[in-house]
UniProtKB/Swiss-Prot annotation:
Positions in coiled-coil regions: none
Motif 'HIGH' region mapped to chain: 14-24
Keyword match RNA-binding: yes
Domain tRNA-binding: 579-681
Protein name (database record): Methionine--tRNA ligase
Length: 681
């Protein structure tokens, strides 16, 4: 048996200023599954995390609520911890960045960087709120857009026209905190000399530490030249003061990743077998993995490894990046009830339903994952209840009634047993590579074979025949052993189901190696239902509970009000029904969206319309600067528009969007349940 690996695993630190939602849970469930698999295999795997508990946003929210920042982060940490525990995310330690371990490590790393010449200082001119006595980040400044004249826009970009600009370009600026007119003021800032580590980062990011798509994105930043990173903020600020610099604080993103180290150090104080230096020293042989979302890639793949290198610590073995979560093909929405908090989900549904669904769709890539609620119900009910649990419920009763609960020693189908054994390494390989979707497909294929074999043998029919009792017991004992195999393979995903199954099977906690064994002449405990079906009414109740209170907006909307859109673009001349009916509108799935070289406004869309593929060039680039966000989304497509030859290729139709143009282009999407190829009537 190979020597046990030493592994330290982290997930990104949730910000201590709000509740956990299902988008967050994607990452923690993904990480927890991988960690549970490692532990089930016998490896020493430690999983740590913490609340990210510093920054102006926390300071200002606490002030607004009339409490201290310390009280706020304590309340939020308790809420986060309860949500994670109830979703069966089993951290070895869940800490806070506002802790003495983190203060000491942040100061030590900063001082090492400073003493090695990797810290620079210079004066920075910023807006200052004279009433609050604080410098203002861009998001705390509002005013009139210098490009289009739209009012109430943020200090760095306009949500109306999409323009970006410097805060000093904003017209009529005001503090979003106090409403005061800000003044320009100089302040000394501290910068981490990231360019000092450019050569190291170019090598490290191409050494197998990142997925290829992530490494390619990082290469774009590296090729564009690295800039020094501002790591300081001025008082008042909730965080750690910079050593020897009164009134200057570490920017939250400096001490946040150090929180991984601090949480582990806090755990080491309670677990003597863990040696902090053995995991974090420069020549450590232990493995270190960070699981993160694609929105924080630059911090974890540029700033963080450079800080570690400069301070004399080891760098991560790998940074595993996942995509965003959509619900029913769209961004989560409070008005649609699809912005679902973890606690709201838990109030209505079993956490293992979501753990399995996420696992079934997760791959090792960075693609976004869609939580399609209709598919969610179907997959859980079919796979977990209809396939896995069904095996035990089919067989257990015959063993209890016919043999007092004692499983006989039986292997009536050696070929099927061998198929389960042969599949184990492939399933393990998929878990190891974070290709959980492939692992679930392999497991469900085995469940299908087990159910088909039991259905073919039909013990319920044999049980009615004279002299067939021995055969019935052999079939059902073998069926229970196949069920046990599936439980072993699913245990990282479904720990509660595994615990309940272990109680029914009357066995110790199952390890991965147990898949090689069969229970023989073994007593079972009484069988009770291990999992129930999802009722669609529970999904509906969860959605309703997630919806914002829109009563005020609805009452406002009830009064007839014009918005000027018909003035901007008057109604077209009337047409008859036949003219409209000649247009063939179809539902299309956007399989791929990409930039078109040499085109300022176009995106190339590859559409799935059910039984065919279509290529469309669409002038929506200004509204969708990240084309990949469109992939997996349903839209409306004019299917019988004559193909148009363009210099970039052939455009086979048109997708539908609303809006005047520029950043105000809104691609149309059908309601949930629509399928590619369906005609719009």
């Amino acid at each position: 048996m190979p020597e046990a690996r030493q592994i330290l695993v982290t997930s990104a630190l949730p910000y201590a200023n709000g509740s956990i939602h299902l988008g967050h849970m994607l990452e923690y469930i993904q990480t927890d599954i991988w960690v549970r698999f490692q532990k089930q295999r016998g490896n020493q795997c430690v999983y740590v995390c913490a609340d990210d508990a510093h920054g102006s946003a926390i300071m200002l929210r606490a002030e607004k609520e009339g409490i201290t920042p310390e009280q706020l982060i304590a309340y939020v940490q308790a809420e986060h911890s309860a949500d994670f525990a109830d979703f069966l995310v089993d951290f070895d330690n869940y800490h806070s960045t506002h802790a003495e371990e983190n203060r000491a490590l942040s100061e030590a790393i900063y001082l090492r960087l400073r003493d090695a010449g990797h810290i620079a200082t210079r004066s920075v001119t910023q807006y200052f709120d004279p009433e609050k006595g604080m410098f203002l980040a861009d998001r705390f400044i509002k005013g009139t857009c210098p490009k289009c004249g739209a009012e109430d826009q943020y200090g760095d970009n306009c949500e109306k026209c999409g323009a970006t600009y410097e805060p000093t370009e904003l017209k009529d600026p005001r503090s979003a905190i106090s409403g005061a007119t800000p003044v320009l003021k100089d302040s000394k800032h501290f910068f981490f000399k990231l360019p000092d580590f450019e050569a190291m980062l170019k090598e490290w990011t191409r050494s197998g530490t990142l997925q290829e798509a992530v490494a390619n994105k990082i290469a774009e930043w590296l090729d564009g030249g690295l800039q020094e990173w501002d790591i300081s903020r001025d008082a008042p600020y909730f965080g750690f003061e910079i050593p020897d610099e009164p009134g200057k604080y570490f920017y939250v993103w400096l001490d946040a990743p150090i929180g991984y180290m601090a949480s582990f150090k806090n755990l080491c104080a309670r677990r003597p077998e863990l040696d902090f230096d053995a995991f974090w020293c420069k020549d450590s042989k232990a493995e270190l993995y960070h699981f993160i979302g694609k929105d924080i890639v630059n911090f974890h793949t540029l700033f963080w490894p450079a800080m570690l290198e400069g301070a004399g610590f080891r760098k991560p073995t790998a940074v595993n990046v996942h995509g965003y979560l959509t619900v029913n093909g769209q961004k989560m929405s409070k008005s649609r009830g699809t912005f679902i908090k973890a606690r709201t989900y838990l109030d209505h549904l079993n956490p293992e339903y979501l753990r399995y669904y996420y696992a079934s769709k997760l791959s090792r890539g960075v693609d976004d994952l869609d939580l399609n609620l209709e598919d969610f119900v179907q997959k859980v009910n079919s796979d977990l209840v209809g396939k896995v649990v069904n095996i035990a419920s089919r067989c257990a009763g015959f063993i209890h009634k016919g043999n007092a609960g004692l499983m006989v020693d039986a292997n009536p189908e050696p070929e099927l047993w061998e198929a389960f054994q042969v599949a184990a390494p492939a399933i393990a390989e998929a878990y190891e590579g974070r290709d959980f979707g492939r692992a679930m497909r392999e497991i469900m294929a085995l469940a299908d074979r087990a159910n088909a074999w039991i259905a073919d043998k039909a013990p319920w029919a044999l049980n009615k025949q004279e002299g067939k009792q021995t055969e019935v017991q052999e079939i059902c004992a073998f069926g229970i052993n196949l069920f046990r195999q599936l439980v072993i393979f699913l245990k990282p995903v479904l720990p509660n189901l595994a615990t309940a199954a272990e109680a029914f099977l009357n066995v110790a906690p199952l390890t991965w190696q147990d898949h090689t064994l069969r229970l023989a002449n073994h007593p079972l405990n009484p069988f009770t239902p291990l999992m129930t079906r999802i009722e669609p009414a529970k999904i509906d109740a969860m959605i309703e509970a997630s919806k914002e209170d829109l009563a005020a907006q609805n009452s406002e909307a009830a009064a007839p009000q014009g918005n000027g859109e018909l003035v901007k673009e008057p109604l077209a001349p009337e047409i008859d029904f036949n003219a409209f009916a000649a247009v063939d509108l179809r539902i299309a799935l956007i399989e791929k969206a990409e930039f078109v070289e040499g085109a300022d406004k176009l995106l190339r869309l590859t559409l799935d319309i059910g039984d065919a593929k279509r290529n469309v060039f669409s002038g929506i680039k200004s509204a969708y600067p990240e084309p990949s966000e469109l992939e997996g989304r349903l839209t409306l497509y004019v299917a019988n528009l004559a193909p148009r030859k363009m210099k970039f290729g052939l455009s086979e139709g048109m997708v539908l969007a609303a809006g005047p143009g520029g950043s105000e282009i809104f691609l149309l999407s059908p309601d949930a349940g629509a399928k590619p190829g369906q005609r719009v009537h």
